[in-house]
Design a protein with these regions (language model features):
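Long, low-complexity, Lys/Arg-enriched
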Residues: 1-69, 83-86, 90-201
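Short N-terminal targeting/anchoring amphipathic segment
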Residues: 68-76
Length: 201
């Protein structure tokens, strides 16, 4: 991945499951980009972690460099290909909310032919800004509608009504981004794996 950050230095992020192969590739990449002063970071993905956790780690690193533009080149084994594909789709889904733009995604064929550009990077789901903010609050531990109203005002400096939060939670449940568990007369919310993939971290 090539991360072109507005604030921090530009860098190439190499992702794989073998640290030896990544180190060799990192040395090669440093030579290719030596005149451009681009940093190279090698990230080894543990194949024992879940898909969601692997994507969360990478998404968090990229969002930590926002605002930025990202180019994702996909090659390697099935695990890396799957993780990077979901990363691309997650970033496109929430990029507008976190100042990350996915400029290009391409796949390198195993026969070492020409790269194949993705004609479109699909969104995992459509979200409004309010839905994304509420989902982020749930990731942060706000689980009841009344808590979310208070958390929304303190985190985003913007008031939101309880009925609006309740409608938003209903939409998030229908999109299978959160689950609601009855606690007395209220519903306690937690993210699903998909909700975690796109908003937590």
């Amino acid at each position: 991945m090539l991360i072109n950050a507005d604030v921090n230095d530009d860098y190439v992020m190499l992702v794989g499951v073998s640290s030896d192969a990544l180190n060799a590739l990192a040395e090669f990449t440093k030579q290719v980009y030596q005149d451009l002063e681009i940093n190279v970071k090698s990230i080894t993905i543990n194949t024992q972690v879940s898909l969601v956790d692997a994507v969360l780690m990478l998404r968090g690193m990229i969002e930590g460099n926002a605002p930025c533009d990202v180019v994702i080149g996909i090659a390697g084994d099935r695990w890396v290909t799957t993780v990077l594909s979901f990363l691309a789709m997650a970033l496109v889904t929430v990029g507008g909310f976190v100042n990350v733009s996915v400029d290009k995604v391409f796949t390198m064929p195993s026969d070492k032919g020409e790269p194949v550009d993705w004609p479109i990077v699909p969104r995992l789901i459509d979200l409004s800004p309010v839905e994304f903010r509420v989902l982020r609050l749930i990731c942060s531990g706000y689980s009841l509608a009344k808590e979310i109203v208070k958390g929304y005002a303190s985190r985003f400096n913007e008031a939101i009504s309880l009925p609006t939060v309740e409608r938003t939670l209903a939409k998030l449940r229908s999109k299978r981004l959160v689950n609601g568990k009855p606690v007395g007369k209220a519903l306690m919310h937690e993210t699903t794996e998909l909700g975690k993939l796109i908003a937590c971290g």
